[in-house]
Amino acid sequence: MIGLAIYALCLAGLGLLLPRVWWDPASPEFILILGGIGAWRYGWGLLHLARSLIYRKLVYPRWRRRADALGEAAMPSHVFLLVTSFRIDGETTRKVYQAAIEEAVRCGVRATVIASIVEMADQRLIKRLFHGIVERMGGGERVDLSFVRIGGTGKRDALAYGFRAVSLHRPPRDAAVCVIDGDSILEPGLLRKSLPYFKLFPDVGAFTTDETCEVVGRPLFREWYNMRFAQRHILMSSMGLSGRVLTLTGRMSAFRAEIATDPDFIRTVEVDYIDHWRLGRFKFLTGDDKSSWYFVLKRGLRMIYVPDAKVVTVEYPPSNRFWAGATMLMIRWFGNMLRTNSRAIALGPRRVGWFPWWCIVDQRLSMWTSLSGPTAVLLIWLSTGSNLIFLYFYWVALTRFAQTLTLLTARDRVSWTYPFLLYFNQVYGSVVKTFVFFRLDRQKWTRQKTTIERGLDRWNARLQKATSAYVHILGCAAFVVGLGLYLRAIHVPNIKYLTLLQ
């Protein structure tokens, strides 16, 4: 917080050095004058913040009291904890399974831990943990351990085999299935906090929880992840007010057993695909959480957010260099989002809900609107030589400081690096989004080398790469020209003048 205080003092000092005309409300250069796009973006952010506070401070506490009042009757008769592990270090695996098994014992109902793994070493470790915990905590008559061995062909296969293993147990109608990543550590009491909502709300098909992280890597990565999870908490809480979260995070989400054992659901998670107008049909490699989310969304069921239940994820950035690691992660995250985006929009606002549906539409719009500010300033500067560029960067510093303070509604601390990381996420993240949007078929895991072969010959593969680059350049050019015409930084030649030239 000391760093943030120094940032605020520097901001105030620079403000005193700015020309007085920039602070004059009657001046056309008044710093607080917002364009239409800027007002929309900031208004949209404030709306999410307000909805988040309403959900966490007013709506959710009422839900919590109602769930607590149900007592033991609110818990399902059987809980399945499906944990997928592949190429996770031994210490993280130990923490993850220890937390999962202890929660299975602690929840007080019949529980089955299903470990979907590749290496035999993991199986031996998990068995030792299980027997040690059951001997120490008791509950051996209620808690079982099962293994699903797969060939390292990817997380989608691991989940599909795990869901089929759940089906073989013939779970009762009120059972729940929790899907946990191999790097996600459950907080004590998570199951008893969250599972009662299936009983309280019969129309809820799934839920997800809050996340924090332990980052193995450079301090800048730690700050970036912490900031993203704070933003996630606000956005998820806002969407929780509508009963339609925008993703069922793969780190920890829970489903009704009747959904998780539905053959169509399992097939969707195992082999999902889209038909693209230019790229043709291609399967999804990553984004299993988006596939499961879309299935529940299509069924018209609610998906809620449980803000007081938490998992701790162990994060290993794919590169020690911040820029490279962030780029690799953004390509995967944004690709997962955009590949499912169009078909979710196609469901329509009546099925999805008006506010969630518009949020999904906004996922596409925001990659362009977020670039409008820096692009507009650059165009004006190039065409007029105006010192507006200095005003713009001060405005960025000021507004990102304000945005950083709003994150205190989600977390106890913020960092002086957040204003810079927020702007990095906005501008560079939008650049990456536009890149991915025109190359939806490019997919890659950051932890494994699993790939999907599309069966294209060399000529067609090169043609698709070339057309992807072409439409990307065309889209960016249209954006710049359209914005330039709107700002009158670019002028269309007079038609009469062109006729005379001919």
Predicted regions and their residues:
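Perimembrane helix-loop junctions in membrane proteins
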Residues: 48-63, 266-268, 407-410, 436, ...
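Loop-to-transmembrane boundary segments
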Residues: 1-5, 82-84, 89-93, 352-369, ...
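Membrane-embedded multi-pass helical conduit in multi-pass membrane proteins
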Residues: 12-42, 362-444, 479-502
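N-proximal low-complexity "stem/linker" segments adjacent to membrane-targeting elements
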Residues: 1-99
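Short hydrophobic helices that act as membrane-entry/anchoring signals
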Residues: 3, 44, 48, 222-229, ...
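Juxtamembrane amphipathic/hinge helix adjacent to a transmembrane helix
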Residues: 343-347, 444-460
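Hydrophobic alpha-helical transmembrane segments and immediately flanking/interface helices
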Residues: 100-117, 310, 314-316, 452-473, ...
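Non-transmembrane catalytic domains and loops of membrane-associated enzymes and transporters
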Residues: 63-352
